[in-house]
Amino acid sequence: EKHLEEASEIYTAATLQRVDLIKRVRLREETSLETYSEAVSLITAVEAAQLALLKEFFGIEFTQASRAFGYSLGEIGALIAAEVYEPEALLTPILKLAGDCVELAQNIRMGIVFSRGPELDVPAIEKLCVETTARNQGTICISSYVAPNTVLVLGQGDSIELFRQTMKERFNRQIHFKKNPDRWPPIHTAIVRQRNVPDRASVMLETVPGGMKAPTIPIISCITGTESYNDYNSRQTLYDWVDHPQKLWSVIERALATDIHTLIHVGPEPNIIPATLNRLSMNIDSQLNARSISGFGLRAVSSIVQRRPWLAKYLSKNASLLRAPLLEHVILEDWLLDNAVDT
């Protein structure tokens, strides 16, 4: 409850509105777009609480990990856990600007662009986003590079439908588009510039406490795709967090190139990172057509080339991707419940 109470106080100070996150958790209230600010506070509080429980009852500290990474708000949580900033320093700018993001989200939808065969031509998709935006029917941008065959786009108004129609006419028939019906805050896209969110955030970040020491463990950033944080550049990196797309695939590649063998997923209901690694593992397993990596042979290589050319390209230059099916995944929320200690 300590972390939820602290997060509630930070929320109240930043928004001048009272919230009781402890009550919300006890009542198991669902979050929504309208309660986006509360969700931000809740997620970071739950992350901190889980890590505190892991340390207090099991003697396992965050700093025992070889490295950390997080998608979107998860990277903010990683910087807090790695003692670069206190929670208030990073949450306050986000909470102060969250209202603008929610207002922008009212006419924003997400599109998933994916391929069942070839690697996506990302520059062509980026170009189509620019072309569609120039038609003055709303801004559309890539918000995340999920994999060589998948990107997420966020678009305003009619831009999503215009993008879909043009994509269907211009791209390979193996390139598909799926529209998500929910509304999404346009974080990690240029859309937030319409409310000057990046500039306002950067001004706030200039004077927040902290940020003048390196993380206690290396953090692979979804902003840069590598371990780029040092003892003074976190503010500059975080400026780009606001309006630049997430480089999730670069992070996955980098993580698999290290010596990690277990991934501990921190926070409430983690989804995109486990899902991305699970899809990669299934793709590799189905092509290897064997019970272990030792079954990888010429026939498997041939099959990969024929059925998943995007995967073949990346395996040829980055064999470490083959480690994906061997990783052990621990959902910390579930693990803590399964190993609860009586007090």
What is the meaning of each model-derived region?
Residues 1-69, 153:
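Helix-rich "cap/lid" substructures immediately adjacent to catalytic or cofactor-binding pockets
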Residues 48, 52, 78-79, 274:
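Short, hydrophobic alpha-helix immediately C-terminal to the catalytic nucleophile
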Residues 66-70, 152, 261-267:
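Short glycine-rich phosphate-binding loop at a beta-alpha junction
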Residues 66-74, 78, 82:
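Gly/Ala-rich beta-loop-alpha elbow adjacent to hydrolase catalytic centers
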Residues 81-233:
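Alpha/beta catalytic cores of group-transfer enzymes, especially the acyltransferase/condensing modules
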Residues 174-274, 302-339:
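Acyltransferase
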Residues 271-283:
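Short Gly/Thr/Asp-enriched flexible loops that form oxyanion-binding sites at enzyme active sites
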Residues 284-307:
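Conserved phosphate-binding/catalytic loops in two-lobed NTP-binding clefts
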